Structures are given as structure tokens and as C-alpha cells.
Amino acid sequence: MSSKTTPAPVYIWTADEAIKFLKEWNFSLGIILLFITIILQFGYTSRSMFVYVIKMIILWLMWPLTIILTIFNCVYALNNVYLGLSIVFTIVAIIMWIVYFVNSIRLFIRTGSFWSFNPETNNLMCIDMKGTMYVRPIIEDYHTLTVTIIRGHLYIQGIKLGTGYSWADLPAYMTVAKVTHLCTYKRGFLDRISDTSGFAVYVKSKVGNYRLPSTQKGSGMDTALLRNNI
């Protein structure tokens, strides 16, 4: 005697239930989306480093959340077409996440900075100030970089890095580290306003996978590999 298995019931979300869900969660969803929008809109290193870090965390969480949702769609696909598309989207999301980690690890090996795992950019601006290596992300591949010192406060492209510097502390070179190569910027113009104020313009001079000599005599530190960074 053969027993027939009862098929599992298929739950269909009706329009009325969708409207009810939106009515119940509309306020919370609106607050969450407003928060994310504000963070993405105003999260810049030149404005607030704290807000920028929150923005990076949100962007970083997008990949695992996307992978989870695409896998969920594969498990609960409505039909074969949705299943096929969900599988494709899952594979693409996983591949892109793996590529992100590979590039981030390569950049971390090059720089030694955890800014290498920034999901927004693979360009890390690096400058050696009296033996302290500052590393910060920049969005674009600039042809020139502006370094400003205002009453001892160090700024690069509007990003505050540190204090206690004079215009004489500005190095002759700085770099922008990327996954596959380094961009060297040479100081092309220097204007002294006072002992603790001035600015310099650095112009891109070389691009390649090479090392720069350390500014510290006898330290053995490689400027391009950027250890002891902040």
C-alpha cells in the first residue's frame, strides 16, 4: 500500500497583507532609511571621521546582507525563472565579495593599514611626517594633492591628520597606494606663511610597483610599505 505525501502549502502574500505590513512598519522603515540616507550623504573624511566610519560599516554590511537575501530567494523561489535569476545573482554577489577581500588583503600587505578594507575606494593616501606615517582613503585618482598646515594642524585634501607640525616638516614625496601599483607625488610648490603655517602642492610624478627610500636614516623603514601608520 503506497502512501501519498501531502504537498506543503504554498503561502501567497496578498496585496492586503503587504499594505498592512507597510502600515505597521512604515514609521520604523522611514526612520531607518532616513538615518542611512544622512550617513551616506554626509559621511566624508573631511567632515566627520566618526560618521565616515559608520558609513563604511553600512557599506561593508551590504555584501553579506545581499548574499543572504539572494540565497533566501534561491531556497524560496516562486518558480524556475526566479530560481535561475536568484542563483545567478548569488554567484555574482559571492564573486564580487571575494574579489573585494582579495584586493583588500593585497592592499593591506602593501600598506599595513586597516583602511585597506575600506569598501568605498582602493586609493590610500600616505604621507610620512617626522617618522609617523599617516594613511587615509581618497575617492579619486588626483593628479595633484594639496597639503596644508594651519597653526600646526596638518590637513591633506581637507582631511585633518595631526597637530604639532611646521611647514619645514613637509616631505619631498608622498604616495598613493593602490592594489596593483604605487603613485608617487613630488612636492612641486611650497609657500610659507609663518613658522607653523603653510601649504604645498604635490604633483603625480611616477606610477609603478616600486619602493621609496625611508625619510628616517638607518631606520630601514620603507615609505612605500608604510609601517607604523595612523
Curated annotation (Swiss-Prot):
Tell me how this protein sits in the membrane.
Multi-pass membrane protein
Q: Which UniProt keywords apply?
A: Glycoprotein, Host Golgi apparatus, Host membrane, Host-virus interaction, Membrane, Transmembrane, Transmembrane helix, Viral envelope protein, Viral immunoevasion, Viral matrix protein, Virion
Q: How is it modified after translation?
A: O-linked glycans consist of Gal-GalNAc disaccharides which are modified with up to 2 sialic acid residues.
- Top-rank taxon of the source lineage equals Viruses
Which chain regions cross the lipid bilayer? 25-45, 56-76, 85-105
Query: Is Membrane among this UniProt entry's keywords?
Result: yes
Localization of this protein:
Virion membrane; Host Golgi apparatus membrane
The residue ranges for the Virion surface side of the membrane come to 1-24, 77-84
Q: How does it assemble?
A: Homomultimer. Interacts with envelope E protein in the budding compartment of the host cell, which is located between endoplasmic reticulum and the Golgi complex. Forms a complex with HE and S proteins. Interacts with nucleocapsid N protein. This interaction probably participates in RNA packaging into the virus.
Q: What is the name attached to this protein's record?
A: Membrane protein
Q: Which organism is it from?
A: Human coronavirus OC43 (HCoV-OC43)
